[in-house]
Amino acid sequence: MSKTKTKPARLIVAASDSDADMLYATKFWAPDPFIFLERNGKRTLVLSDLEIDRGRKQADADEFVMFSELEREVQGKSKKAPPYEKVLAHFLRKRGVKSTIVPANFPLRYAEELAANKIRVRATNGFFWPEREAKSNKEIEMMSHALRITEAGLKRAVEILKRSKPGAGKRLRWSGKTLTSEMLRAEIDSAILRAGGIPTGTIVAGGDQGCDPHERGFGPLYANTLIILDVFPRDAKTGYFGDMTRTVLRGRASAAQRKLWETVKAGQALALKKIKAGVDGMTIHKAIQELFAERGFPTELRKGRRVGFFHGTGHGLGLEIHEDPRLQKVTLKDRQVLTVEPGLYYPGVGGARQEDVVVVTKRGCKILSRFPKQLEL
């Protein structure tokens, strides 16, 4: 009689505050690494004395083990506490684990210790939990809430910009002071916190600063200048991210600024019409580039600097701000949640980007973002 092949155990060692796979598995927030083991359908957590009682109340698991008990077993009569990886290997040996599947970011020293104990370690390529790619109705609901938090930040930014007035040198003034990127970012982040979110790297980039897509922005903001507002907070309760970008201008736009902004808006509208399960994302990306070039905005090198549309069209969104897939590198699938964020960047005119979040469907896509697009404030 042939023996039944035992499936490898699924193993994560990470802090769920910063590791999406661990948070997805356990629904439990913790700032320090702990052990997750799934074997034969049973989920076990190894937690510190500090966290185990809270874990029993909050975490999605079948069994809870105290790390300190395992540590004492390994330490024996030694006066020195054993390294974490020794305790991990001991725990797996006690459970009879011979083979494991781990995330791609599994710590090397842990993998080496397990290998030394004849425990096979195989890293995944892509999602550790494949089901993370197609979002459930509950996840879509949670991400919609994260977008409402995002919109609270954008709303505050627009309110302040509308109240600001141009001063000397066209510097915007608000509340008796020169309005800076730092001040506006602080106001956006405060609104996010009040709405139940965690700010993460909010971008307020005016003028040519906006031509570097990940420049956070610094210094005074000016009238009649394009300002990129890219807001991507995390819901403090669920861990899911929102992500939206609007490009605005306080004052009057020049013909060149308006053309840039309108072209980006048209590029995003084109993408939204083409998104559908089964479509090659690269065809969408190329269609946007072609539209931009036809309207006089080629992507090229000028004086050693990239101009035009030189980043991706969008990315997956969920428990990570950037997760698989990259829109332009895959065939789209039903229930993927993606950002759609074309942009154009030309020093001297400025940068413009519009970003919304969609759910891919078999018939097209559903837009989850609600915040309006308005150039002049």
Please give the residue ranges for each predicted region:
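Active-site neighborhoods and metal-handling regions in enzymes and metal-associated proteins
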Residues: M1-L377
